A protein has these predicted regions:
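Long, structured stretches of catalytic cores involved in phosphate-ester chemistry, encompassing
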Residues: 1-119
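Acidic, His/Gly-rich catalytic cores of divalent-metal-dependent hydrolytic chemistry
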Residues: 115-130
């Protein structure tokens, strides 16, 4: 099964706040060691998805690390992006929702804006196996 974790301030971000840096890095390292698949955050008023990254912001050699989603698109005033950090793969400046499906061995996502358009979507394998 997939391991999903949620907290408020993202470790990585293209936004004004530029992520939480050193404050969350030790927790990210722990989650990575425990096989976390997804980290959901808000705080920034936009949608952003990253490649799987280690606590230092690098893609792991084996591709196995948590993938962060920043989803602060629930209705507050949106604000723009700064220069996207390394490995930011999708950015949407529209109100909307993130739909996740956690299934045996994989997860999928769709970011749907308020007009009903799918603005980002994908599928990935889970890191952990559960009996």
């Amino acid at each position: 099964g997939c391991l999903l974790v949620m907290w408020h301030t993202p470790l990585y971000s293209s936004g004004f706040h530029r992520g939480s840096g050193d404050k969350m890095r030790p927790l990210w390292q722990l989650l990575d060691r425990q096989g976390a698949d997804l980290v959901l955050s808000g705080h920034e008023h936009f949608y952003e998805r990253f490649d799987p990254l280690d606590a230092e912001g690098r893609p792991p050699g084996d591709g196995q690390a948590p993938r962060q989603f920043v989803v602060g698109t629930g209705g507050a005033r949106l604000y723009g992006f700064w220069k996207p950090p390394y490995r930011s793969q999708a950015r949407v400046l529209e109100h909307g929702v993130l739909q996740l499906a956690l299934e045996r061995g994989r997860y999928s996502w769709r970011f749907i804006d308020v007009a009903g358009r799918v603005r980002d979507a994908g599928v990935a394998r889970c890191r952990r196996t559960m009996n």
